[in-house]
Amino acid sequence: MKNQIKKEILILGNGYIGNRLHEELDVELSDKRIHSLADVEDEIKRFKPAIIINCIGYTGSDVDDCELNKDKTLTANTFIPIILGEAALRNKIKLIHISSGCIYHFDYSGDKPIAEDKIPDFFELFYSRTKIYTEVALRALSKVSPNLIIRIRVPLDNRPHPRNLLTKLIKYKKIIDIPNSITYVPDFIKALKHLIEINANGIYNVCNKGALRYPELLDVYKKYVPDFEYTVIDYKELNLVRTNLLLSTRKLEESGFKVRQIKDVFEECVKGYLKY
């Protein structure tokens, strides 16, 4: 990414994704907690960005925690992104909002991978509802203030972190075996750079092609850590409300970005992970 573009970018939200982007993009990261439009305006005056990447969000320890902390969830996942959208409009700044693909029902027996223009329909989790509310608002704002909404799904990374899918699976020991769309974080960062460089607007699913079945990834991990053991259980045994789905990557590919198959990153991911 060109140095001039880097100088114009400000990241808000210093959690997992925000810090990964800060590290890889080498751009400004605000450490200020945003509570109001005035807070955003202060950061805009301080950094003078042309692009704001919003990585602010709340999931708690997991999405079930959002059911217990609806105030925090609604504030971080809906209220603040809408404030950022208003600030972007007022200051003629582009907003890039990091969203989630966990907003759909999916029927594995007949559905095709979900494209960006399908209307979100998964309201069973409060977390998902807050993500949907935000997308509706930002899509309305986009008619007068172009923005970019990036949907990622179940981040998988090549370094340990509590939010990393591989870290979670190693900890769980008992896992389900359902194909899911996954976002490999190093590829997500490359895709984000690409979308910034082509000045993309609208909604993009940013995940890898194909589907990940958790045992496939853990079998690669077990190849390098032979003592590791895991058990596959039936999804119903979890007794939890979750989204399991496949997202289409066609739009991202048609933008000129080469999307890798998720299965092609397993070795790279595990080898990188074990170096830490």
Predicted stretch roles:
Residues 2-25:
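N-terminal Rossmann NAD(P)H-binding glycine-rich loop of SDR-like oxidoreductase domains
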Residues 12, 52-56, 95-101, 150-152:
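SDR active-site strand-loop-helix element
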Residues 28-39:
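Rossmann-fold cofactor-recognition segment
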Residues 37-77, 89:
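NAD(P)H-binding glycine-rich loop region in Rossmannoid oxidoreductase-like domains
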Residues 71, 75, 79, 103-150, ...:
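Catalytic helix-loop patch of NAD(P)-dependent Rossmann-fold dehydrogenases
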Residues 136-187:
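NAD(P)-dependent short-chain dehydrogenase/reductase
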Residues 191-244:
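Mid/C-terminal beta-alpha module of Rossmann-like enzyme folds, strongest
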Residues 213-219, 233-276:
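Conserved C-terminal active-site "lid" loop/helix of NAD(P)H-dependent oxidoreductases
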